[in-house]
């Protein structure tokens, strides 16, 4: 039985390290750590099939823009007959503090357009790993446009990379359906802020 691990993001070099591409960054790190083969394009997505210990896994990066993420995920899940309980979506979440990780199954999409697209095509009964990017830190009392914020690059990329490494290190707990244990393991011991580190 396959597991489908999909990271949400936007294609293109200009978006590579943006907050909205946290999902892509996590999937890339998983692929690197577990020696997955190079991604190839199928069904409007980049996919790679490999193993995480004893688990057979398909990594997916929808190669559509965020608002259309659901279609390639639905196509791949249908092709490989993957049940919703074996689908894990990694995505950014503005309502969660920076570099805080939350896991849930089902529930609302909190206005996230990538999740809306998936919900519309697959329903809601899949797993979500929510990577906190927080809301903009505004010390000047100027209004910061949320779409500009999520499409901008992280400032504290070191904290992001450390958090992603924690996710990758404990990913098997998610595959074993142990979300509470996973969240405990990936909890950062210090509170990070997404501000320039230099």
From Swiss-Prot:
Species name: Ehrlichia chaffeensis (strain ATCC CRL-10679 / Arkansas)
Top EC class for this record: hydrolase
Protein family membership: Belongs to the PTH family.
InterPro entries: Pept_tRNA_hydro, Pept_tRNA_hydro_CS, Pept_tRNA_hydro_sf
Positions annotated as active site in the UniProt record: 20
Discriminates between blocked and unblocked aminoacyl-tRNA, annotated site positions: 10
Residues engaged in binding tRNA: 15, 65, 67, 113
Database matches in PANTHER family: PEPTIDYL-TRNA HYDROLASE
Gene Ontology BP annotations: protein quality control for misfolded or incompletely synthesized proteins; rescue of stalled ribosome
Reaction catalyzed: an N-acyl-L-alpha-aminoacyl-tRNA + H2O = an N-acyl-L-amino acid + a tRNA + H(+)
Enzyme Commission number: 3.1.1.29
Compartments in which it is found: Cytoplasm
Primary role: Hydrolyzes ribosome-free peptidyl-tRNAs (with 1 or more amino acids incorporated), which drop off the ribosome during protein synthesis, or as a result of ribosome stalling.
Annotated GO MF terms: peptidyl-tRNA hydrolase activity; tRNA binding
UniProt main location, coarse: cytoplasm
Superkingdom field: Bacteria
Annotated site location: Stabilizes the basic form of H active site to accept a proton: 92
GO cellular component: cytoplasm
Keywords: Cytoplasm, Hydrolase, RNA-binding, tRNA-binding
This protein's name: Peptidyl-tRNA hydrolase
Subunit structure: Monomer.
């Amino acid at each position: 039985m396959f597991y489908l691990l999909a990271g949400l993001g936007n294609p293109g070099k200009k978006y590579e390290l943006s907050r909205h591409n946290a999902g892509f960054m996590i999937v890339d790190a998983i692929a690197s750590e577990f020696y997955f083969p190079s991604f190839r394009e199928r069904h409007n997505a980049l996919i790679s099939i490999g193993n995480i210990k004893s688990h057979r896994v398909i990594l997916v990066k929808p190669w559509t823009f965020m608002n259309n993420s659901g279609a390639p995920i639905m196509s791949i899940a249908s092709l490989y007959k993957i049940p919703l309980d074996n689908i894990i979506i990694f995505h950014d979440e503005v309502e969660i503090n920076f570099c805080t990780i939350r896991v849930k199954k089902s529930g609302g999409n909190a206005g996230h357009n990538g999740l809306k697209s998936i919900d519309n095509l697959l329903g809601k009964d899949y797993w979500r790993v929510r990577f906190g990017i927080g809301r903009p830190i505004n010390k000047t009392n100027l209004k910061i446009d949320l779409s500009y914020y999520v499409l901008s690059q992280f400032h504290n990329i070191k904290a992001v990379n450390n958090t992603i490494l924690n996710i990758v290190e404990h990913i098997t707990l998610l595959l074993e359906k142990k979300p509470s244990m996973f969240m405990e393991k990936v909890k950062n011991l210090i509170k990070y802020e997404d501000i320039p580190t230099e």
